Amino acid sequence: YTGTIDKNGTLNGDIVIEGGIDPTLDSKHFPDRETFVSAAVENIKLWGIKAIKGNIRPEEKIQPHNAVPKDWLDADVTEDYGAGVHSINYNDNLFSLIIDTSSGRALVVDTVPHLRSIQIDNRMTVVNRGRFSPVVQRKKNNSRITLSGAMRRMQEPIEVVTTMPHPAVGLCADVRETLESEGIPVEGKKVSASDSDAMQILSYESPVLPEILKSLLFRSDNMYAESVQRKLGESIYGDPQREYGEKAVTKIVEQWGINMDNVTLYDGSGLSRTNRMTPLFLASVLRSAALDWQTGDLFPTLLPRCGVDGTVRNLLKGTCLSGNIALKSGSMTGVRCYAGYSPAERPRYSVVLLTNNFHCTYEQLKSSIERLMVGMFESYQDTIDKRQNTP
């Protein structure tokens, strides 16, 4: 906090939340952790603060206008897989629009969290029959949302989930709302208190990095991937902007002696269509990661096993490779890719398969990929099984 706490417990200053790019802050993917909001409010009370003259405000190194890479499609940024990365990521950077259609008009009556700065251009219509098809549009790094499409007339409010343009605003709103519900008013006045004399109330740590990476890889979470890349750039170069994350990844790959000719790394997740890489490049990265003394024992264990885990739980299911090959999946329109290791437990091969511009159905492609992989590794797996069953 900034300022001072008087004898009555009034803070003549602000509560300042400084972000560390942690993608897991109050994330639904780590449900067993105490929420940051609860921890913050509890610690504010422990410091004897009973009222706040100032505000709840964020301190951010990544500003909202740099949250989403410039070449991501606008159509992606309102989807959960297109959430930008911020210094303060909160609630998976998602929020809900609460829409009331009971009157015959589609009215946005609330947002959760409360986002006072959001601008909404509401063009939705209400129909008594037909498909429920709301459309949410927003340009990159912009807080103006356009709503269109048809909504069914219903007596109960309808919830539409989309990405937060500025998650720190939502977090500060939730902290303020929780404080006030606990009897600690926040006046929101401008106070003259220097940040240089601020006192630390709480240090809230993320889960350990392997847990974050495992969640990322199992679910193929773009926002988590972007956060890890930004943090890597900050750790090596002291700057969390996307360019330094890209530079940090390039530095590590070059230290492994991998040729980066014809390779373009633009973002941390692969959602950008500017990215260019070859199967040989990815296989070389996987091989180096498995042999590196710092990552070799850990990284292969973080990948989901085909037929068992995560986004590849239905791939190779019921085959001899189920549970025996670990792959990270990646996909977008016209693209389906897999990269990982075989065998899953003690990698001997790095495995990469990239498909682009296919014209068959996904199920047809999946069947072809499974036949290819089983044909490649079946004889090797039979040999392993025989060795394990030999007295």
State where each predicted segment sits.
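A conserved catalytic-loop motif detector
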Residues: R57-R116, D121, N275-C320
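Active-site-adjacent loops and short helices of periplasmic peptidoglycan-processing enzymes
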Residues: Y1-V85, Y90-D92, L97-I98, N142-Q155, ...
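Extracytoplasmic
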Residues: T10-D14, A51-K53, A83-V85, D92, ...
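Small-residue-rich helix-loop
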Residues: E226-P391
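A small/polar active-site loop signature that marks catalytic segments
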Residues: T125-L298
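Short, low-complexity Ser/Thr-rich regulatory SLiMs
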Residues: G3-K7, I99-T101, R138, Y341-E345
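Short, Gly/Ser/Thr-enriched beta-strand-loop segments that form substrate-interacting elements
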Residues: I118-K139, T162, M199-E205, N314-E345
